[in-house]
Amino acid sequence: MKQENKIWLCYFIVTGLLLIFTNSCKKAKDTPVDKLPGNEVTDKDGNIYKTVTIGTQIWMDENLKTTKYSNGDAVPTTILDISGESAPKYQWAYGDDTTNVATYGRLYTWYAVTDSRNVCPTGWHVPSDAEWETLKEYLGGESVAGAKLKEAGTTHWQAPNTGATNATGFTSLPGGYRTLNGAYASIHLSGYQWSSSDNAPLGWGQLMRYNDSLLVRGGYYKPAGVSVRCIKNI
């Protein structure tokens, strides 16, 4: 009888350990690798961003929010018309309302995002046009890439937010833009993203919209305020 009890006791111990091991593995497997604790990066203002791996690239899963370059220097802001400035380096909260920053990040001029002091955290950078095109190609091309990058639903995007699945975890948001004369437009409608590449007299960028599934390459006025997603150095 004692021998039989020992056998059952061993059975329950082994079974319990197997269940614990199985559940632990399941939790790790069910959590995307790019979202596991520790895969985060912090900017000079102390903002913490989770990261997402798409193909061979590692991206932040939020728009940049910092007011400082990676060396600690301030990226200034202004409420003025900057159309008369030759190479303005500024950042803004959409509508000059800082409550928008937590969700949509800040808007930066192309001159600020290409400054050698680097608006992205150390070890990260503003993606080049080629890096954006690599992302687009990996996701199946211009016609479908936007849908896989946009946050799903209509909490932040205006309906219908066509095709949006956020299959990548990139969670693109419609942060709008700032014009040279200080007007703001397109929040909830469009998500613009700078690249670091020049298309003189414009800067290359990418656009996603609420009413299609596209990721569209375009040239934007360099003094305009546009969102930024940082990509990890490899």
Where are these regions (language model features)?
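Beta-rich interaction/scaffold domains
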Residues: K2, K26-K27
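Bacterial N-terminal signal peptides that target proteins for export
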Residues: K2-F12
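C-terminal motif of bacterial Sec signal peptides marking the signal peptidase cleavage site
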Residues: F21-S24
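Conserved positions within compact, well-structured domain cores
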Residues: K27-I234
